[in-house]
From Swiss-Prot:
It comes from Toxoplasma gondii. This is Actin depolymerizing factor ADF. Interacts with ACT1 (G-actin); the interaction results in inhibition of actin polymerization. Interacts with DPA; the interaction enhances ADF activity in disassembly of filamentous actin and inhibition of actin polymerization. CDD domains: ADF_cofilin_like. GO terms for molecular function: actin filament severing activity; actin monomer binding; protein sequestering activity.
């Protein structure tokens, strides 16, 4: 199911900085109205990255693992149903714009699902 969600230009620009310049290690994206935008980014480790994800809401993220850039669909089990559906149906729109991120998203529902990023 396609959502028709737009992707803000800054998402691609920040991703390229992560991929090429390595100025940040991770980026968290959120849906704002009908567009995917950058919410925050950081240079810290996996623990800092996990701390940047909301406990009760969905997000997209990318994390530079060194040998690959992992795309993450963060949908905690306690997030409302509508955002979970919106994020799930919108991930391909963002993935298509982020050239170099893993094609298969790591779908995480709890912090333990993010253990492979350590």
């Amino acid at each position: 199911m396609a959502s028709g969600m737009g992707v803000d230009e800054n998402c691609v620009a920040r991703f390229n900085e992560l991929k090429i310049r390595k100025t940040v290690k991770w980026i968290v994206f959120k849906i704002e109205n009908t567009k995917i935008v950058v919410e925050k980014d950081g240079k810290g480790n996996a623990d800092e990255f996990r701390g940047a994800l909301p406990a009760n809401d969905c997000r997209f993220a990318v994390y530079n693992c060194g040998n690959k850039i992992q795309f993450v669909l963060w949908c905690p089990d306690n997030a409302p149903v509508k955002p979970r559906m919106t994020y799930a149906s919108s991930k391909d729109a963002l993935l298509k714009k982020l050239d170099g991120a893993t094609a298969v998203a790591l779908e995480a529902h709890e912090m333990g699902d993010l253990a492979p990023l350590a």
